[in-house]
Amino acid sequence: VGFSIVLALFSSCNNSKKGKDGRTDTYSSGTISFVSDESFSPIIEEERAVFQYDYPQATLNPIYTNESDAINKLLSGKTWLAFSARNFKNSEIQSLKAKNFRPVAIDIAYDALAFIVNKGNKDTLISVKDIQDIMTGRITKWSNLHKGNAHGTITVVFDNPKSSTVHYVEDSILGGKPIHNKNVVAVNKTSQVIKYVEENPDAIGIIGNNWLNDKHDSTNLTFNKNIRVMSVSRIHPATANSSRKPYQYYIYNGEYPLVRTIYALLNDPRQGLPWGFAHFIQGPKGQRIVMKAGLLPVLGDINVRDVNVNQ
């Protein structure tokens, strides 16, 4: 109810007014462009489609790029909304405020970082320490990871060298240190990471879990059948009992170790359509879309029920 009232107030107050910058968009109408890390495109596209259906006078034009370029566009005033896996830095907030912007970060979802391997690779358990050793080059072969694995040199596959995925690995898994592995491949998009892993038996790919789920499974417990999703353990060595797949429940209870927040970063002094879209995602309908997509909502009641997993 509160969201509807605010929406109506902004629409009626701003609908016919043009700002000094020439903008005419309101909380629920007009045309804007926004930027997003490409790894979040599935969930952002779902949110955008519903928002534009509910508010047909609004047009949202997405630009999907890497996290670094997305935030640079936001900081330089080329856009008023960016979706990222990191919050503003204090220095960025001060810089934007000095330019009369209004930097605000809104939590919209929790996403898990998933490790995927070829369908022919039977090893599906990995510990955080194993991941650290692979990323720093201490482990280079599958046989170093698990004795008896006949696969050869491990090829690590990322979506983009400047993506939120790489940033998370370096910042949260490696403690701020860079990746040092000679066998790293950076493709252009997350869909290409999945394709690379499908076609290369020695590959291990790192993607956001909103790319994994079978859209026909309302329980979000069925992953893409063309690849294997690894179970990750905080404890080393990884065992079946200590390892978890990036299911919503394990994100919710904290047992899956690789979880990140998705932020809507705003620098819009007008509080127009960028604010409307960001708050829609954080609102009841937007959070239901987040849940349906296999991510974890930041707001709302979570109901847990038992299901059988045949995977």
Feature locations, PLM:
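Exported/periplasmic ABC-transporter solute-binding proteins
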Residues: 14-56, 63, 67-68, 72-73, ...
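Acidic, polar ligand-binding/catalytic clefts
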Residues: 83-106, 234-244, 249-250
